[in-house]
Amino acid sequence: MYYVLGVYIIIQTGDLVQVWGDLTLMTASVFMLFTNIAYAIKLACVIQRRELIQKIIFDGDNELDGQKTKLAIQTVERYRKDTIRLVTVYFSVAFSSVFGITFSGEKDQLPLRAWYPFDATKRPAYQWTYAYTILFFIALSINAAVNLCCDVLVAALIAQCRCRLRLIAQSLRTLCDDVDVDKKGRITADSEKVVGSRVRSIVMRHQLVLAQVEQLQQCFSVPILGQFAVASFIICVTAYQMAFVTNLYRLISMASFEIAVTIQVYIYCVAGTNLTIDSDEVSRAAYECPWYECPASIRRLLLVIMVRCKRATVITVAGIVEISLDTFMSIMKASYTFFTVLQSTGEL
């Protein structure tokens, strides 16, 4: 896998150096080169932090699989279905774009620009190079699948945190269910022990989720930074290339690639926004629970949860940019700005 990725980055870099100065040819080389560079960064980080990632997955699965109430099981199942739906859509769009770009080369042109130590435009070198490209497509498909899995892994782990936060909110709302209340509307002494134990358990679960969010930021901050930095440029370069495409099939395949890269950024940003929303839900749930039936000691614990939730739970890129839909819109605006600059430069 490293060999295939390394070889392709080398030949694409060589082609970029060879056509340096020709804006149209440079953009034709750059959009796949940058995609592979971002993928290499993600893959390296995942391999380097694999033990911590495995621990995060194991800890989260233990809690989610251990749910016993009907409402909690339904919540876990809903988050799983949402993740599966996301994976299906993302993989469908991404693989259709990879397949389309690979097999949409025009006559006497290779599907993707790359540097070779011979003239690949003359026969029979062209046929052999094209055949090599098609065979290479199998390896690229595997690499593309792993690249997509890296993105889905982050989104799934964030969804795992969101699900755990949602379960905590449900536990708070049902905090005083099945407990005895005296004539004054206060829980009895025996029930106080039960509710106190529940609150302490909720506090511990909340702390574990916050710790998992910190671990996710530690693991994926660098690859997400690389993805965001590269994505805005890839989106504008692909749009610029589409302006010069005359082959309808290739135009459609490049449009699907543009959509795939946009989705690639979107799944990070929407996951980050939803994480913040579900975190705020915990604070609301603490206020909505029947705290007025509880003694002062339990109220203080609930207040601690509410105060902690005032600080939004977010994942940041290198501690600078929050992963949110606002960031997604900023990336799209930057892409459009780069696109207009390229257009203006090309018209000179």
Language-model features: locations:
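Membrane-anchoring/interfacial helices and their immediately flanking loops
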Residues: 17-18, 25-35, 39-42, 54-61
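Membrane-helix interface/capping segments
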Residues: 46-69
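Terminal membrane-anchoring module of integral membrane proteins
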Residues: 73-76, 87-93, 159, 177-348
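Cytoplasmic, membrane-proximal interface of class
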Residues: 15-20, 44-50, 209, 215
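Hydrophobic alpha-helical membrane-embedded segments
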Residues: 32-52, 144-164, 264-271
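Helix-loop-helix junctions within predominantly alpha-helical proteins
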Residues: 1-29, 62-158, 163, 170-189, ...
